Curated annotation (Swiss-Prot):
It comes from Secale cereale. Its EC number is 3.2.1.182, 3.2.1.21. A beta-D-glucoside binds at Q92, H194, N239, E240, Y383, E456, W504, E511, W512, F520. One of its GO terms (biological process) is carbohydrate metabolic process. The keyword Chloroplast applies. Changing S514L: 62% loss of activity with DIBOA-Glc and 2.4 fold increased activity with DIMBOA-Glc. 42% loss of activity with DIBOA-Glc and 4 fold increased activity with DIMBOA-Glc. Involved in defense of young plant parts against pests via the production of benzoxazolinones (hydroxamic acids) from hydroxamic acid glucosides. The preferred substrate is DIBOA-beta-D-glucoside. Can also use esculin and genistein glucoside as substrates, but no activity with salicin, p-nitrophenyl-alpha-glucoside or substrates related to cell wall components. This is 4-hydroxy-7-methoxy-3-oxo-3,4-dihydro-2H-1,4-benzoxazin-2-yl glucoside beta-D-glucosidase, chloroplastic. It holds the Pfam family Glyco_hydro_1. The lineage of its organism: Eukaryota, Viridiplantae, Streptophyta, Embryophyta, Tracheophyta.
Amino acid sequence: MALLVGGTLNPTTHLSLRSRAGRNSENVWLRSAASSQTSKGRFCNLTVRAGTPSKPSEPIGPVFTKLKPWQIPKRDWFSKDFLFGASTSAYQIEGAWNEDGKGPSTWDHFCHTYPERISDGTNGDVAANSYHMYEEDVKALKDMGMKVYRFSISWSRILPNGTGKPNQKGIDYYNNLINSLIRHGIVPYVTIWHWDTPQALEDKYGGFLDKQIVNDYKYFAELCFQSFGDRVKNWFTFNEPHTYCCFSYGEGIHAPGRCSPGLDCAVPEGDSLREPYTAGHHILLAHAEAVELFKAHYNKHGDSKIGMAFDVMGYEPYQDSFLDDQARERSIDYNMGWFLEPVVRGDYPFSMRSLIGDRLPMFTKEEQEKLGSLCDIMGLNYYTSRFSKHVDISSDYTPTLNTDDAYASSETTGSDGNEIGPITGTYWIYMYPKGLTDLLLIMKEKYGNPPIFITENGIADVEGDPEMPDPLDDWKRLDYLQRHISAVKDAIDQGADVRGHFTWGLIDNFEWGSGYSSRFGLVYIDKEDGNKRKLKKSAKWFAKFNSVPKTLLKTTNNNATVTASVSV
C-alpha cells in the first residue's frame, strides 16, 4: 500500500514517521527547515548484533542502469512452491464508497472533510473502480501468470457500523472476487485490515485509541473467517501498523489525522507523544484476540495460516564506527521491532521500554502469553533503505518520538558523500536491494527464521519523469523489481525461509496523501478511458517470467513447502 503525503509537514515536529505518508513523508522528524528529506524508521538500544549484513552486491551507481541479460532473474531460480503475485488494498482500488450498503470509513471522512490534505485534492470515491471491475483485475493477474493475489477487506463494507448486522451485499462482493480468483487458478491472500476503520467506531469512541476496538475488531475478523475461510487459507490481521500509528496519530497526515495542538495536521487535538503507542498497543491486542480465535475455531484442519504484514526499512551504519553500528541496531528495532517483537516474544523491545517509559503501555502477563509465537507467517513490506547516524541528545531534552527513536538520524547519504542508491520517481524511495537481503537474514538469525512473504515491494511512476514519458514503458520499475527479486534469492541461498514475493501494486490506485499523482501499479489505469486496465512493460515481463513450466522447477525452497491450494 504505497503512499505519499499531501500538505506541508512541520519541520519542527520531529516525528519518527516512516517515509510513506503516502509514501511521501520521509522520516518526518528529519525534515529540517531546509526541507531535507530522510526516512522512516525506529530505533532501539540493542547490544546484540541484529543479524550479519550480507556481502555488498555489485554497486548500483548513482543512476538507474539496466541489468545485463545474464543478471536478470529467472523463474527457475526459485522452487515451484515459491509464489509470485501482487497486492492491493480496499480503499485504494475499490471505489463504490457509498454503494450497496457500505458505511463510511475513516478515509472516506478524511478525504471528504480535509481535501486539502491530499496533494491533488482527490479521494477514493471511485479509485480504480474495482468494486465493479474486479474481473478485469483478475484477468490482469492471469495474463501475468501470477499465482497469488493479496487484497484487503473493507471493514465498513461488510459491517457499515463497525459492529452489528453484516451487509450481505458487501460480503457478496468479496465472495465473487474470491471465487473468480480460484476459477482462474489464483490463490487469495487476505489482509483483514488495511487502514480503513469504520468512521462509526471513530465517532463512537475514537477508534484505535480506545480498547473497545479490540473486541470490535475481533467480531469483524470472525465475520471474515466465517464468510471466506472455506476458500481463504492465508490471512494477515493488520497491514503496516507502524506506519498507521505514526502517520495517523503522530503526524496527523493520514486518517483520522490527529496530532498534538500546535502542529500542522487535520485534527490538532491529540497527543503525538502518546497516541501512536496507545493505538499500536490496541492493534497488537486485537491481533492476539483474532489469531487466538482463528486457531481455536477456524483452522480445524490445520491447513490455514495467519500472521501480520510489517513495514520495514533497511539500514546501514553512516560510517564504520561503534556508535553508528549501534544506531543501526536501534533503527532496525524501532522500525521493525515495535510490532514484530511483541508477536514473536510477547513484549516490546527493551530499548523502547527504556526510552519511552510510561508512554508505552504495559502488557499483562496473560496478554504477553497470548501474543508471543502466534504468527504462522510474516509479511514484510520493503521499499528502501537508509544510513543510520548516531545523534547525541542531552538527558534533559524534551521527549519526542524522534528522541525515543533513539539518538539516531536516518540519512540518504553516507559519510563518504554517496547516496545509498539511485533515487526513483518517488523521492523517498532509493533503490537498495541489499537492504532487503539483510532484513531477511535478520529474520533468520534473530527471529527464528519464520516463513516470510515479501508482501509489498515496488516503486512509483510520477508525472513528468523525462526518462519515462510513456506510462506503459516503466523500465525503472522493471529494473527495481528484477534487482529485488534477485535480492530475495540471495537471502534464500543463505538460508532465509522466504515463500513468496508480492509486487506493490497490481494496479495504479489512490495513493493516500498523494492522490493519483503517484502510480505504483504493474497495470496502468487509464482514467480518461473508463479506468481501462493496460499492462505496463513490467507486467509483460512477469508474464514471460512466470511462463516456465512447473516441471522444470525445483520441488521445494529451503526444504520448506507452502500451502498454495484452496478448496472451493
